[in-house]
């Protein structure tokens, strides 16, 4: 899928936003990634979505979808970093859409289909400064890795010396399926619902649906305890691995005030959380990940 013409026309231009220099378009190159989708309870998922205009995308009955995706961004405007996304597939509108239909390519624009990002730890401080301060993503710096082994690809997310989340995906036998798509990310920041779009392409491999091809482990850190209430399926609906991707993050952002029936009583996180951040590309120490001991395992490094 081609990026919009406006983005293609930006090629070769430059921007300076929040003191971060960007060579446009905002792109990534040669970046491997993994993805795994698990079914979850739609009612419990709805409790994690802020506001009343974003709704869990139901796959069937009262089952929605938890999306775990991790990217080893090897070449970007702001250096190399790992990004660990925890999100819920969603629709955007006054009411929830029917089951499954919003996931169909021709219906996605009608239903505002995308993913609501619950948590987005990253390796570097500058990634937090840009991703959160500009696009409103819930980024924060954490202990992350991305490990490619002969039979598996995995990532572990630690914080404050505790395990938060670990995901491991079996490597498919065939990893050369061409794939290109565009998706939307929804996030809550500064009392607003923020929407950003990303286009990416690459070659991928996918495992058979509903097999034990991916393993998700939720730790005991308080930050991720809400995930334990989602009734996450033991087997993924699908899982896959991208040996390399090329991506473009749209510099256009949509935002709406988050409104409620009653006046909000708590102040949402705002610009004070990013105002003092610098542009360091240094990573925190890697987590204590058992995958690092596998023969032939290769871990991402700064």
Question: Which role does the model predict for each range below?
Answer:
Residues 40-43, 73-76, 91-95, 125, ...:
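Generic structural motif
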Residues 68-119:
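Hydrophobic/aromatic-rich structural module bridging two neighboring secondary-structure elements via a short loop
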Residues 34-36, 84-86, 155:
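Hydrophobic residues positioned within well-ordered beta-strands of beta-sheet architectures
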Residues 60-63, 91-96, 111-115, 144-145, ...:
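Glycine-rich loops and low-complexity Gly/Arg-rich segments
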Residues 28-30, 62, 78-82, 149:
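Solvent-exposed loop and beta-edge segments used for protein-protein assembly and interaction
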Residues 18-69:
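N-terminal ordered "arm"
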Residues 23, 72-78, 141-143:
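Catalytic micro-motifs at enzyme active sites that drive phosphoryl/nucleotidyl and oxygen chemistry
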Residues 2-20, 119-302:
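Interaction-surface and assembly-scaffold signal
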């Amino acid at each position: 899928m081609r990026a919009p013409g406006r983005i293609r026309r930006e090629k070769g231009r430059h921007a300076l936003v929040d003191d971060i220099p960007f060579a446009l378009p905002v792109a990534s190159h040669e970046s491997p990634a993994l993805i795994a989708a698990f079914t979850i309870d739609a009612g419990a998922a709805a409790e994690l979505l802020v506001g009343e205009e974003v709704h869990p995308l139901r796959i069937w009955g009262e089952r929605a979808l938890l999306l775990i995706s991790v990217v080893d961004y090897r070449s970007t405007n702001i250096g190399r970093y790992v990004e660990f996304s925890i999100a819920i597939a969603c629709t955007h509108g006054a009411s929830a859409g029917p089951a499954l239909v919003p996931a169909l390519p021709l219906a996605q624009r009608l239903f505002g289909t995308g993913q609501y990002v619950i948590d987005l730890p990253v390796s570097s401080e500058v990634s937090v400064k840009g991703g959160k301060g500009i696009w409103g993503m819930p980024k924060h710096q954490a202990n992350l890795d991305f490990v490619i082994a002969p039979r598996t690809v995995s990532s572990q997310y630690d914080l404050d010396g505790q395990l938060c989340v670990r995901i491991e995906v079996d490597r498919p036998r065939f990893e050369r399926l061409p794939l290109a798509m565009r998706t939307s990310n929804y996030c809550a920041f500064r009392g607003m619902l923020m929407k950003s779009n990303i286009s990416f392409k690459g070659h991928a491999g996918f495992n058979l649906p509903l097999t034990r091809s991916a393993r998700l482990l939720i730790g005991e850190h308080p930050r991720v305890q809400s995930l334990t209430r989602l009734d996450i399926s033991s087997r993924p609906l699908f899982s896959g691995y991208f040996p390399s991707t090329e991506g473009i993050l749209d510099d256009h952002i949509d935002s709406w005030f988050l409104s409620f029936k009653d006046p909000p009583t708590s102040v949402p996180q705002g610009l004070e959380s990013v105002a003092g951040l610098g542009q360091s590309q240094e990573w925190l120490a890697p987590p204590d990940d058992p995958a690092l001991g596998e023969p032939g395992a290769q871990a991402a490094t700064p």
